[in-house]
């Protein structure tokens, strides 16, 4: 724990710093501050009262203070608390993460004549030391994957699905079929429990590439209408889903028959011939390979930056991200990888440790990328910001955002878009040549 002081003509602040970026602060204000707050409080209360013989807002100050002492006290304390928080945010180098990061605030004293004091307990922005760029360990870029004839043939098979005949069948499902599944969760034995859809009419291909072995075994050789009920033994999953019974329903078994690609079909896809389609497909696959290489380089840069330096992180952000990732990993294991309850229990500790490590990495990168963005002098253009806002808007509202979108929502979209661009640009700077990362310490 360390203690430090900050002061100006109006305020004096003492802070004590604790682990988890938790800071306790004592803000002392001189009488000029409380006098100003008292004057503003009086003005606010006067505007809202009407006394016999006086126009609204024109009653004498002493009468208003006498008759509306409770309202005056409440407004004075509100204004004084706000002024103290603003002083804390502006004067102290351990600023609160946000108003929501304040765990508690208490007005110890507040008097127009004698001044006042407020005690705060809050989470602050972390202190990040200078980044030791010379220690950055970033592997050399991997070569772009070459597109093989097998890759091209597999690509053509996927294109052929566009022309495939999709026939619902009554026979049991076979390897290579598609099945339409719905999954509901409910509370076993509860007559008032209404099943809740986890997904409906979702299509799965019965194959080793697209299904885990246990999931595939459940839905191979089953017919339309087949139902699988499965009790959830894991208390974690029960809590996440608010239920203990999973019900899978096979809505349809669909046989796929894909034709051989030829010149005629290629022309329907805006190609001159089958050979021309192959050339275009190769270009598409090469572009995908380049993007995969870029994503791998991006991921390597994230790892390198996260490992570059350690520092204390905000406790609540870390806990919030860890809880989110733990939930995702456990649900993914149970509902996507289709682990049994016993398999999930065996994997649980490893998954939770993985979530803890991933959470720490994510929160570290949140703050490190902001530091890199600042140190490197990076910038965001209006066009980039507008594009990213459009992306965020589509994610939030779909293709048609509401016409009466509020200013508050617009500000939220701006902040989210700016955060994403800041993160991306900082990581892309890391993924460039190491020699380009040398910066003058601020």
UniProtKB/Swiss-Prot annotation:
Keyword Chaperone set for record: yes
Catalytic activity: [protein]-peptidylproline (omega=180) = [protein]-peptidylproline (omega=0)
Top-tier EC class: isomerase
Keyword Chaperone among UniProt keywords: yes
A GO-annotated cellular component: cytoplasm
TM regions (residue ranges): none
GO terms under biological process: 'de novo' cotranslational protein folding; cell division; chaperone-mediated protein folding; protein transport; protein unfolding
Domain of life: Bacteria
Cited Pfam families: Trigger_C, Trigger_N
NCBIfam families: tig
Free-text note on domains in this protein's UniProt record: Consists of 3 domains; the N-terminus binds the ribosome, the middle domain has PPIase activity, while the C-terminus has intrinsic chaperone activity on its own.
Function: Involved in protein export. Acts as a chaperone by maintaining the newly synthesized protein in an open conformation. Functions as a peptidyl-prolyl cis-trans isomerase.
Name of the protein in question: Trigger factor
Phylogenetic lineage: Bacteria, Pseudomonadati, Chlamydiota, Chlamydiia, Chlamydiales
């Amino acid at each position: 724990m360390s203690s430090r002081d900050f002061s100006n003509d109006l305020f004096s602040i003492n802070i004590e710093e604790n682990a988890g970026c938790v800071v306790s602060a004592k803000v002392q204000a001189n009488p000029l501050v409380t006098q100003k707050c008292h004057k503003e409080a009086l003005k606010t209360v006067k505007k809202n009262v009407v006394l016999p013989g006086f126009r609204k807002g024109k009653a004498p100050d002493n009468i208003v203070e006498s008759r509306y002492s409770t309202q005056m006290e409440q407004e004075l304390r509100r204004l004084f608390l706000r002024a103290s928080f603003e002083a804390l945010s502006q004067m102290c180098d351990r600023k609160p993460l946000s108003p929501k990061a304040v765990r508690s605030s208490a007005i110890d004293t507040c008097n127009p004549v004698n001044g006042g004091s407020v005690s705060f307990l809050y989470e602050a922005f972390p202190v990040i030391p200078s980044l030791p760029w010379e220690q950055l360990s970033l592997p050399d870029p991997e070569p772009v994957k070459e597109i093989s004839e097998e890759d091209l043939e597999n690509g053509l098979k996927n294109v052929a699905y566009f022309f495939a005949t999709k026939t619902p069948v009554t026979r049991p499902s076979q390897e290579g079929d598609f099945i339409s599944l719905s999954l509901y969760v409910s509370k076993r034995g509860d007559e008032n429990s209404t099943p809740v859809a986890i997904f409906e009419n979702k299509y799965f291909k019965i194959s080793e590439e697209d299904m885990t072995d246990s999931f595939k075994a459940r839905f191979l050789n089953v017919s339309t209408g087949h139902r699988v009920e499965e009790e959830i033994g894991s208390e974690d999953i029960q809590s996440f889903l608010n239920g203990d019974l999973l019900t899978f329903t096979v809505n349809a078994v669909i046989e796929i028959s894909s034709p051989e690609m030829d010149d005629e079909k290629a022309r329907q896809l805006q190609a001159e011939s089958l050979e021309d389609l192959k050339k275009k497909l190769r270009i598409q696959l090469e572009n995908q390979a380049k993007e995969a290489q870029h994503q791998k380089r991006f991921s390597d840069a994230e790892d390198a930056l996260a490992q570059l330096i350690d520092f204390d992180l905000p406790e609540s952000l870390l806990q919030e991200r860890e809880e989110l990732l733990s939930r995702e990993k456990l649900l993914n294991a149970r509902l996507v990888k289709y682990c049994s309850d016993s398999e999930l229990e065996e994997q649980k500790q490893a998954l939770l440790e993985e979530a803890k490590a991933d959470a720490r990495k994510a929160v570290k990168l949140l703050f490190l990328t902001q530091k890199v963005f600042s140190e490197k002098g990076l910038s965001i253009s209006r066009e980039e910001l507008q594009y990213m806002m459009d992306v965020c808007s589509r994610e939030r509202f779909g293709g048609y955002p509401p016409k009466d979108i509020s200013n508050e929502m617009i500000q939220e979209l701006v902040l989210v878009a700016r955060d994403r661009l800041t993160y991306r640009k900082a990581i892309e700077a890391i993924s460039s040549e190491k020699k380009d990362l040398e910066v003058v310490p601020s």
